[in-house]
Amino acid sequence: MDDSIMDIKEIMKLCKLNEEEMAKYLDLSKNLDHKTDHSRAYRTMMNQTRRELLKYIGTDIRTDRQIEIEFQTDIEQLRYHLSMLEQLFYIMNTESGWKATPRGIGFLENAIMGE
């Protein structure tokens, strides 16, 4: 096994979802059609802004305002990109702010960080 690839236990330690949020994430993402999902994920993550958003959220909790200040972009455009990441279960909008899911952290750590 490649030691540079982060395993699920490491990913779960980094995830900021609380127990209730994790249960919701697991429920929503349990019936993914992996073939269709892979294609959607590929197309979605080809967008530089979305990759940068996922990096910025990372293992932190980010508010809409923090994201808006960091990206200096129209809030409606940011909401569109955040929505795309949320539909793929890479991030969740929680009461405390945007959080990366285990899937998002896995993608971030195993695919994006090498950029």
Region locations from a protein language model:
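Short amphipathic alpha-helical interaction segments
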Residues: 71-87
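Short alpha-helical segments that sit at the start of domains
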Residues: 23-52
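Residues within the helices of the helix-turn-helix
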Residues: 64-65, 83, 96
